[in-house]
Amino acid sequence: MMGLARFGLKKMENLEFWKLFGSGTGEGFTPIPNFSVYGLLCVWESETAARKALLNEELFKKYMSRASHTSAIFMSPVSSRGYWSGAQPFIAKKDTPKDFVAVLTRATVRWSKLKSFWKEAPGISNRIGTDKNVMFKIGLGEVPIRQQLTFSIWKNLSHMEKFAHQTGSHRD
């Protein structure tokens, strides 16, 4: 069903950008697929449009009826770098958050770096998995093995920055 979603998403009113993701086993930070956990990122014209679509669009109704668990997380970007499929979907709109902060990191792993990337993944997964400042985390893939992303929610920005810039192999 996930692969067919692109046809419905292309037709949705007020949907400015979207991406479908698969996940890896465990917390998602492995190259072995988990065919029961998927992700969908949507950038809407407004939060009102997003909430209306979640309630009324047939695609979302089907997902809700078939899934054992779903989560919808509404966010406003505070920072963004680079392009994604030729677009800049996240336009910073808010000041630096005082409390919870969600982070989405995305990378296309070079073929020559795949082995070292996946060799480092278990260590990073273990560290983020035991960090008491992480509220939620999952590894996802836009394209299996190569185009990877992480999505995490932290208690605050300083905890996330400390993890990202001061811990072992994740530093570089």
Identify the residue ranges that each predicted region occupies:
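A common structural junction motif
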Residues: E58-S65, R171-D172
